[in-house]
A protein has these predicted regions:
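Short beta-strand elements in bilobed, periplasmic/extracellular small-molecule ligand-binding domains
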Residues: 31-55, 142-148, 205-211
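Extended hydrophobic packing segments that form well-structured cores
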Residues: 370-473
């Protein structure tokens, strides 16, 4: 990533304080369990430790810590039964989900030889889960439950914890980076239009506006020939260029990529949405002709770059890039009715990390269809297998909504005129998919990632408090 971000996850554990003087052996038992539990939290996030809470005062102290850190998620370990006042003061001032983790130490009771202390310390983590959820509901807090076991290991529970932490990374990325809008959306594509103040209010994402005149001059001061040469080689390593590629052939493009990378770092950019509708010539025309591969190099490094000024699909691309490692701009492209296949793809910048079937290609075209000018197009080749699509839209009141679907990319003929396109089969069939997806009212762009990611997207949506339409999976 050109701009790195790290989610902050508040972690604490609760137990009923009245048990501890009655059964002193529970103190070291719970301390050991909590220390072990914290090791289950992935190193990819920053752990904000609220400690073991057995009183309201300790809960308040944990809450102060979480609030000061601006945590993206709270994970609560239930050690044994505890009353909900051990929990609520820690989360009452937060607007993030609380994940209740009920991990029982022993896989099964030794019924004949279990005393009260052993039951409370090793077999009673499930005792208060329902109570916690009931009070989180009444407090208007979002929540989730993970149930599992420590003895013998529990990959399913560990995977759920890791998935929640992965989803939390999205919130941190939206809060800690900015979105650059260069120019304005494609004229008349009203589904793309957006209120940037509402965007900041609801999704924590701040928009910085840039004029094309500034972008045209962005590489004027780039003189480090070693950096340009290294970036030119990176471009050649990323793309097969029609007619052959050389360092000299992509030198100017590499110069712009070096400049754009520094711009992304200076402005803390996680997202770029751009569109140009002029008749650029000279230096401006040169940049316009090579902008698609230049932005593709940024996408590869974690900055979502969307064509046609589509901020919403830039967000979708970033979400998928953050949780899956890839985020490819797409749209409904065509339908192969005899094969019952949807052709999904788009022209413009894309993500080399999705191109597992073949090395991405770059070619020059005389005209960008529907736009002014011509230049380089890039095409990416997702491998056959599961694929996830994510669209983002808004209702009449400005609330955001996610639209998601899972399908399977199948091998077969694709278009070869320079645009990325995939042959996707959906369980509901191509006709019904097109109807259902369209009826959900997404923008006409979507993001794509190889793999099945709906479960993680549902967690992201809960973190942002955004509804989700699941079309098919």
């Amino acid at each position: 990533m050109l701009v790195n971000t790290k989610a902050r996850v508040g972690v604490f554990a609760i137990a009923l304080g009245a048990y501890l003087p009655q059964f002193p052996s529970l103190v070291p038992e719970f301390e050991a369990q909590y220390a072990d539990f914290k090791k289950r939290i992935p190193d990819s996030v920053e752990l904000i430790d609220g400690g073991i809470v057995t009183t309201k005062e300790l809960a308040c102290a944990a809450g102060d810590k979480f609030r000061a850190a601006d945590v993206d998620l709270v994970i609560l370990q239930l050690l044994t039964y505890a009353t909900s006042y051990n929990m609520l003061p820690a989360v009452c001032d937060l607007d993030v989900p609380v994940v209740l983790v009920n991990l029982q130490k022993k896989a099964a009771p030794d019924y004949a030889n279990t005393d009260t202390a052993t039951w409370l310390g090793e077999l009673y983590a499930c005792g208060a889960v329902g109570e916690m959820v009931a009070d989180l509901e009444r407090a208007g807090k979002r929540h989730a439950v993970i149930t599992g076991v420590v003895e013998g290991g529990d990959p399913e529970a560990d995977a759920e914890i890791a998935d929640w932490c992965r989803a939390a990374q999205v919130r941190r990325r939206f809060r800690d980076t900015n979105l650059a809008q260069i120019g304005r959306p494609y004229p008349g594509m009203m589904d793309l239009y957006i209120d940037e103040t509402n965007l900041y209010h609801r999704m924590f994402l701040y928009t910085k506006q840039f004029d094309w005149e500034k972008m045209w001059a962005i590489a004027d001061d780039v003189t480090d020939e070693d950096a340009i040469r290294a970036k030119a080689q990176d471009i050649l390593d990323t793309f097969d260029i029609e007619g052959g590629g050389t360092i000299e052939k992509v030198w100017d493009m590499a110069k712009y990529v070096v400049a754009f990378e520094q711009w992304v770092k200076d402005e803390q950019l996680g997202f770029v949405a751009s569109h140009y509708d002029g008749f650029a010539q000279g230096v401006a025309g040169k940049l316009d002709s090579m902008l698609i591969p230049a932005f593709s190099m940024l996408i590869k490094q974690g900055t979502a770059c969307a064509v046609e000024g589509d901020i919403k699909v830039a967000m979708a691309m970033s979400i998928l890039k953050t949780i899956s490692g890839m985020g490819q701009l797409s749209e409904m492209y065509s339908i192969d009715f005899p094969e019952d296949i949807c052709i999904i793809g788009h022209s413009g910048s894309g993500d080399a990390d999705i191109s597992k079937a073949k090395k991405p290609t770059m070619k020059i075209v005389p005209v960008f269809h529907g736009k002014t000018g011509g230049g380089y197009l890039t095409q990416f080749y997702p491998a056959p297998g599961p694929v996830t699509y994510l669209g983002i839209t808004q209702d009449r009141d400005g609330h955001f909504k996610f639209v998601v679907a899972e399908g399977v990319n199948e091998p077969g003929p694709i278009f070869t005129f320079g645009d990325t396109n995939m042959r996707t089969r959906f369980t509901c069939g191509a006709r019904d998919f097109c109807n259902r997806w369209s009826e959900a009212g997404p923008t006409h762009h979507m993001a794509a990632a190889s793999g099945r990611w709906i479960d993680t997207i549902l967690k992201v949506a809960k973190i942002f408090n955004v509804p989700v339409d699941v079309i098919t999976r």
